């Protein structure tokens, strides 16, 4: 790390920008100097001037210098915005979110540090040449947090990519060997079939037709049997349902007949006589029990 706390690559980028800014600053200073020189050559030709003439000359010079300085300041601000845009665009390609601290731009200590760095860069006689002329990509700015995780993930993916390449190469070799072996086996099989062609006949078309007819007949018979069983099952289910209904109807008729028989029996003379006799017998039994109770000794 150098004086600004940056690595060599970023320090070279800072030096390039400082050279660019110094060049633009020099051009603007020359423009301001030319304003004064033009004033001297065009207006200061008399030996004496009145107060109004001096005031007019100074006002004109002030307007020109003000315009030049304002133009330079505006251009510098726009240039800084373009520089930040480049950095942010590169950071977004790495899915990074950079942050800036505006208050640090007015830190006198840091500004003096930059000034000393510029002086050292100007006076240094052994500056390293900047060989990298290609457009760089912004690397992670710190070694922790999201940037560190992203860097580790990139390294892991690179290692995995190398492993996959090696594995793919191995698989390609195995596939090539397998294809060669397959070709050899196919050729051997063709040779064997040609050798057996004169010794053994294959299935004839007629045999195949007979086999198809037999299969069709078996299918038809099976379907017929299946249909018969289905019809028999349906018939049995219908008969069972009919029998259940008949059984319920007979049970209901039997129950009604029993009720009717009991009702008719209760209406007969024999039933009434028997009921009357039973009533009398019960009364006699009650009377006898009362009499017996009178003769039983008391405890």
Swiss-Prot record:
Q: Which Pfam families match?
A: Leu_zip
Q: Where is this region: Interaction with BSS9?
A: 145-299
Tell me its family. Answer: Belongs to the LZTFL1 family.
Task: Name the coiled-coil region(s).
Answer: 96-296
Q: What is this protein called?
A: Leucine zipper transcription factor-like protein 1
UniProt keywords (A-Z) are:
Bardet-Biedl syndrome, Ciliopathy, Coiled coil, Cytoplasm, Disease variant, Obesity
Q: Where in the cell is it found?
A: Cytoplasm
Q: In which tissues has expression of this protein been reported?
A: Expressed in prostate, ovary, stomach, pancreas, esophagus, breast, liver, bladder, kidney, thyroid, colon and lung (at protein level). Down-regulated in multiple primary tumors (at protein level). Detected in testis, heart, skeletal muscle, thymus, spleen, small intestine, and peripheral blood leukocytes.
Q: Which GO terms describe its molecular function?
A: identical protein binding; protein-containing complex binding
- What job does this protein perform? Regulates ciliary localization of the BBSome complex. Together with the BBSome complex, controls SMO ciliary trafficking and contributes to the sonic hedgehog (SHH) pathway regulation. May play a role in neurite outgrowth. May have tumor suppressor function.
